[in-house]
Amino acid sequence: MTGYEDPRLEKMFLPNDKGDYVGIRIGIDVTSKSQAQAKYSNMIVTSSTPYLWINAAEVAFLKAEYELRWGTKDAAKALYEQAIRLSFEDKGAKDADAYIADKTRKPAAYNDPLGNYSATALSSITIAWEDDSAEGADKAAIKERNLERIITQKWIAIFPLGVEAWSEHRRTGYPKLLPVPTDKSGGTVDVCLLYTSPSPRD
């Protein structure tokens, strides 16, 4: 979200002790709770925050994906843009139209404030919908990039539904996530949760 200079960021997270927005990379070793609270951003979620089951933006993103795969390109684009506007409205953020039109901003590199787990971004996907009508355009590649746009923006819009976000990634491979520093899965994302040993049945 920082690479996109996303106006929703400040509505969803608190800055760290330096005023920056920095998430904790999955699978890193943070040994001190106080250090984590100071150096990384925290979610703006309290005990009175309503539980999100599904929001209007997610519905529009689902429709956009359907239209991209089996419907019309114009409908997919319109629904993608509507979904982002709905997400901005839901989060109380402004300037959705400028955000939707942005053709240059891309995901930022991850700069770990502790200095141990920084990494370059794995995706260069921009926000604005990509048109495939130009002569000689690689329609299949553009369709795949637009799918990445839909799922990346959907990932942002459905926060803080972690299980749902995990399911979207398993299903589509998007958004492109940094691998955990200690990779015990061979570079793949788990498709089920394993019981501990001994299992509850033992």
How should each PLM-predicted stretch be described?
Residues 175:
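Extracellular glycan-recognition regions
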Residues 129, 184-194:
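Short, intrinsically disordered, charge-balanced linker/junction segments flanking boundaries
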Residues 195-202:
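Conserved small/polar residues in nucleotide/adenosyl-binding loops
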